[in-house]
């Protein structure tokens, strides 16, 4: 019984591994001219519009900066 559980855990880990390998996180800066220090939600929306066609689920993080947003998003 223990061998079956260990086998299932290893199998699930191996099946999930390509998902982590195939998605690459990209970091890019975009200008944001509406506000000196934009809110994080504004950065997420701006990053999604600029790089993923509006798909906010692919945006990992949007960090506000001085008249810019630093975007972290995945490909694929």
Swiss-Prot record:
Residues 1-23 form the signal peptide. The lineage of its organism: Eukaryota, Metazoa, Ecdysozoa, Arthropoda, Myriapoda. Its main location: secreted. Voltage-gated calcium channel inhibitor (Cav) (8.6% block at 10 nM), when tested on DRG neurons. It comes from Scolopendra dehaani. Expressed by the venom gland. Belongs to the scoloptoxin-15 family. It is found in: Secreted. Has the structural arrangement of an alpha-helix connected to a beta-sheet by disulfide bonds (CSalpha/beta). Since the toxin contains only 2 disulfide bonds, it is called 2ds-CSalpha/beta. Keywords: Calcium channel impairing toxin, Disulfide bond, Ion channel impairing toxin, Secreted, Signal, Toxin, Voltage-gated calcium channel impairing toxin. One of its GO terms (cellular component) is extracellular region. The keyword Signal applies. GO terms for molecular function: calcium channel regulator activity; toxin activity. This is Omega-scoloptoxin(15)-Ssd3c. Contains 2 disulfide bonds.
């Amino acid at each position: 019984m223990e061998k079956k559980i260990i086998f299932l855990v290893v199998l699930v880990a191996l099946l999930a591994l390509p998902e982590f390998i195939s998605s690459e996180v990209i970091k890019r800066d975009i200008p944001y001219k509406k506000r000196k220090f934009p809110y994080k939600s504004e950065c997420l929306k701006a990053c999604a519009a600029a790089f993923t066609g509006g798909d906010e689920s692919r945006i990992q993080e949007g960090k506000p900066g001085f008249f810019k947003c630093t975007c972290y998003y995945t490909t694929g």
